[in-house]
Amino acid sequence: MKKFFTLLLAVISTMTAFAQTEPAIELQAEVDGNTRTLTIGLGVEGTVQIDWGNGEKVTSEVIPAFDGWNQVNVSGTVSGEGKVKIYGDNIVCFECSSTVKGAKVLSLDVTKATALKDLTANTNKLTAIDLTKNTELEKLTISNNQLTSIDISKCTKLTTLDITNNLLTAIDITKNQALQTLRIGLNKFAGELDLSTNPTIKSVYAQINELTAVKIGNNTASKPTFSFNENKLTSFDATGIEDAANAILYLNGNQLTEIKLPSTKMKTLNILKNNFTLATLPAPTVAKTFNYAPQNNYVIAESYKVGDVLDLSSQTSATLNTQFAVYKSDKTALTEGTDYTVADGKITFLTAQEAVYVTMSSALYSKFTGTSIYKTTGTKVEGSTDINAVTAQGVKISTAGNEISISGLSQGDAVTVANLGGAVVANFHANSSNAHVQAAKGLYIVSINGKAIKIAL
């Protein structure tokens, strides 16, 4: 029996010695003569040896068994060709992050460190990494690198993935059902991000990409947070978020015109700088904290003529009760009744202006105020022809006494005559080529089939 145990110890000793001849982790680093630090955690108490590039193995101090917090920093100076080798068994935590101005890690091989649970390699120059042997990995943080692709299909225990600020265009997380936190911001992700196969994912940060669609699916996570700021989304469906009352959703800086929300009031909804209008914004009660102002400007034509009508009637209603005002580009207010009129959301321009815009405000959406006011794009109001002008349809308008005469009408032409206060004097469809309207002295807007002109009696 004694001989058996002696033999067993010899075998174990031989195996350990053999294991130590093969590095568990290898990395290629830039050589700048400065000290750099590696952070290591072991599954059981022990030591590691590190060859910093000169062929000599330096034994670390005793490293306690890793409990999630007690990893040990090991420092040295990279030399030679920058090939650093880490020897040791049961390495469960490893970090080789670099400083912004310091020397970087160029490549990293962890295929033999199969016990790894926590790997961090931020702010380096990694273009690829093989994780196919790291099936125990639970946390991967590898932001600020140059990765163009990554395969995490074998990392089925992964709960946290941070690959922020790389060059990635796509990622497959269908095999990562344990994933709770996903950080993929500042990449080049395009097309659709499908999260429907990960119903328990709790936090997703995918800001500053080129995503055109996101599929949430039925999300059952408690207190979920989703950030898709600064993408190219035009619509969004959040109806599958079960814990809506505690959900946070950021969609700022997209191209949204439509959003579907849970029936339950959300905790936070941010949709600033999208293409919503007063008519398409969600109700102000959809979230406890709802930030929607400013929005992208409402796009109108680049130019109008005096007498033309800008129809913004879609942006008002009995509920909205929208207030309209016109300003020059220097923010000087124009005078209603002199420079323009407003009637049911239709603005008629009365004077030529080099550059103006229209503001729209509603008590229902009170955050549209100050620099965050909802407004149109800029436009130019060009001078119109005189009283006896011939319109584009060949219609001639003239005045005499208290009568406005219109000739050259076609059967069925829609004719409206209104004063500058918006009061309609006449409204009819032509049944002959000539029409006459009696009115008191003053300024009027004559509109024919939507084209208008200012005249004076």
Model region roles, listed by residue range:
Residues 386-457:
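C-terminal outer-membrane/trafficking sorting elements
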Residues 2-8, 12-118, 283-383:
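N-terminal capping/linker segments that flank leucine-rich repeat
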Residues 94-96, 117-121, 138-142, 159-163, ...:
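Conserved hydrophobic beta-strand positions in leucine-rich repeat
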Residues 93-145, 154, 162:
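Right-handed parallel beta-helix
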Residues 224-226, 230, 247-257, 263-311, ...:
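Leucine-rich repeat domain C-terminal region
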Residues 94, 108, 129, 150-152, ...:
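Canonical leucine-rich repeat
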Residues 90, 112-116, 133-138, 146, ...:
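Leucine-rich repeat
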